[in-house]
């Protein structure tokens, strides 16, 4: 029976909010209908945004509380000149002449002999700078560290709780200063000492990310609450940095996608004239292309941290399990190397599979390059990537990546050089592996295309050279990165 005609003057019926997904299991997301089932989706989204905006305006009107004292402030201030002088005495004797341009890197972590993995990608930048004739000092600000100076792979590093980095800036003129993963504990000790220096903030993701990007990593309400508070603090922090007279001359993002995403996450605009895009460098000499044998399409490599679910360890396990019952499985050789909270997923799933090697350990760059030469396919699912350095390194070596269309991935790969599944699409990952194994010509064609893509986009001449020009450390077209691109 047809519905009776609506009487003139009667308002149209309100569209109901979409029904909740009642599928059991944790998915990390709520539904607009969880606000209340008497609201439309538009009403629910509007009330959440506007009420949230009012609360944030009140919160951000209050100055941020200062960092808690370390208890060493007076000692550090008194000792900083001596520590810096001792550092210079050792570093200057080993570096280039006084006419070489000087550059200071400020970070929270830097590699040591005991921990060679701490911000290794920053160290690779430093080595390229040194090779180009730049004198580089590295200042590590760690509020829990004992001040010291050490050398790592030809780089002189000064560690302190903040006073030492400020003393470096007051004592020596640098052509440029770069901070990676800028957070309040790095910013507060040096902000006043940056006067007269060209300062650049490198935006990799962690420092300007909203809690929802990593929601799957939170398992309790307390963890979610802490993550939300942390996001609010970051949003307030970046407003302070943007407005500070000694704030960054440029905010350097590793991808165009991350420039857009960071502005959405921090709910502010990084002015176009103060931003640049410079991708993380890939060492194409170490990760050099060696033509693949067609049989290497059956040799699959996963080498990555499994510290959180954004790295997709669970997706990789499920994709491989889908191939276990196919005729391809007996021809496959899978190598899984890594560590982290979720690495046990591999150990549990493949304990009885003779063709799957699972090793819980970290590997150095040289060994990763050797592993690349032995394999043909790089399984690298993801839920969030601002670039994807491990994927690009594998591509440079000629491995074909099998990944997800998440974050900035499409900025660095396409269907000519990678198998790209939708977000969370395990079947798509398995199908990508299957297609490569069933078509040797496709595998070889994509292998060559993957290596060519990296050399045309993220090799040193397209990254480090651009970066040095941007910061006035080398000649370049206008001394600029891809700002406003």
Map each language-model feature to its residues.
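A charged, aromatic-enriched C-terminal amphipathic alpha-helix characteristic of glycosyltransferases
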Residues: 157, 441-471
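Membrane-proximal helix-turn-helix segments that form the acceptor-binding/catalytic region
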Residues: 219-251
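Conserved donor-binding/catalytic core segment of Leloir-type glycosyltransferases
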Residues: 292-311, 317-321
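Nucleotide-activated donor-binding/catalytic signature segment of Leloir-type glycosyltransferases, i.e.
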Residues: 345-363
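Short alpha-helical donor nucleotide-sugar binding micro-motif in glycosyltransferases
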Residues: 370-375
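Short hydrophobic beta-strand element within catalytic cores of glycosyltransferases
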Residues: 400-403
């Amino acid at each position: 029976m047809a519905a009776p005609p609506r009487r003139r003057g009667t308002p149209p019926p309100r569209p109901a909010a979409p029904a909740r997904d009642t599928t059991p299991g944790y998915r990390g997301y709520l539904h607009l209908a969880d606000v209340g089932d008497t609201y439309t989706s538009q009403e629910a989204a509007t009330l959440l945004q506007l009420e949230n905006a009012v609360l944030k305006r009140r919160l951000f009107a209050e100055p941020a509380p200062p960092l808690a004292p370390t208890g060493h402030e007076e000692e550090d201030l008194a000792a900083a000149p001596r520590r810096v002088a001792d550092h210079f005495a050792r570093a200057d004797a080993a570096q280039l002449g006084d006419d070489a341009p000087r550059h200071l890197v400020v970070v929270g972590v830097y590699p040591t002999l005991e921990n060679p993995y701490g911000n290794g990608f920053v160290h690779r930048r430093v080595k390229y700078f040194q090779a180009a004739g730049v004198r580089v000092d590295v200042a590590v600000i760690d509020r829990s560290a004992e001040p010291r100076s050490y050398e790592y792979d030809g780089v002189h590093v000064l560690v302190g709780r903040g006073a030492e980095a400020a003393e470096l800036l007051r004592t020596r003129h640098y052509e440029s200063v770069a901070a990676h993963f800028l957070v309040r504990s790095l910013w507060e000790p040096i902000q006043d000492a940056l006067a007269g220096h060209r300062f650049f903030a490198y935006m990799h993701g962690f420092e300007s990310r909203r809690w929802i990007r990593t929601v799957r990593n939170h398992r309790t309400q307390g963890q979610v609450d802490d993550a939300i508070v942390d996001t609010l603090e970051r949003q307030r922090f970046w407003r302070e940095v943007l407005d500070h007279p000694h704030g960054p001359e440029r905010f350097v993002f590793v991808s165009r996608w991350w420039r857009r995403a960071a502005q959405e996450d921090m709910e502010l605009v990084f002015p176009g004239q103060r931003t640049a895009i410079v991708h993380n460098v890939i060492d194409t000499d170490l990760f050099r292309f060696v033509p693949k044998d067609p049989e290497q399409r059956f040799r699959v490599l996963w080498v990555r941290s499994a510290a959180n679910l954004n790295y997709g360890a669970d997706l990789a396990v499920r994709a491989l399990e889908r191939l276990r019952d196919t005729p391809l499985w007996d021809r496959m050789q899978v190598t899984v190397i890594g560590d982290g909270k979720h690495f046990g997923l591999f150990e549990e799933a493949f304990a009885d599979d003779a063709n799957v090697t699972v090793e819980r350990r970290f590997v150095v760059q040289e060994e990763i390059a050797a592993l690349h030469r032995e394999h043909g396919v790089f399984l690298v699912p993801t839920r969030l990537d601002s670039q994807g350095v491990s994927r690009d390194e594998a591509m440079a070596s000629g491995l074909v990546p099998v990944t997800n269309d998440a974050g900035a991935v499409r900025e660095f790969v396409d269907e000519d050089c990678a198998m790209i599944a939708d977000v969370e699409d395990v079947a798509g990952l398995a199908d990508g592996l299957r297609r490569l194994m069933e078509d040797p010509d496709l595998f070889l064609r994509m292998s060559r295309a993957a290596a060519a893509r990296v050399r045309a986009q993220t090799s040193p001449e397209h990254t480090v050279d651009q970066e040095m020009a941007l910061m006035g450390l080398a000649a370049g077209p206008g001394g600029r990165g891809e700002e406003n691109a």
